[in-house]
Amino acid sequence: MNSEEVKAKLKAFFMSDLGVDGSVLNYDTPLFGEEIGLDSVDSLEIISFVDSNFNVSMTGVGKEPFQSIDTISAFIESHKA
C-alpha cells in the first residue's frame, strides 16, 4: 500500500468511524483542536485502527504523529515491517 492509499484509508476511517466531516478534512488538517475537535478517546480509536489495519503499533508514542493524516501516514510508512 502506497502513501496515498494509506492516507485515503485513514481519511475514510475518520469520516466513517469518528464522524468527521469530509468536506473540512484534508490530509494536512490538524486533527486535535478547534477545526476537527478530536479528543483523547478518539486517539485510542486511531491507535487501534492503525494497529489492526497497518500492523503498526502507535501505543506509547508521543502526540507528534497524531497531528494530521499526513503525520499519521508518515509514522506508518516509517514503522512498517
Region roles according to the model:
Residues N2-G37, I46-S48, S52-A81:
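Phosphopantetheine-dependent thiolation modules in NRPS/PKS and related acyl-activating systems
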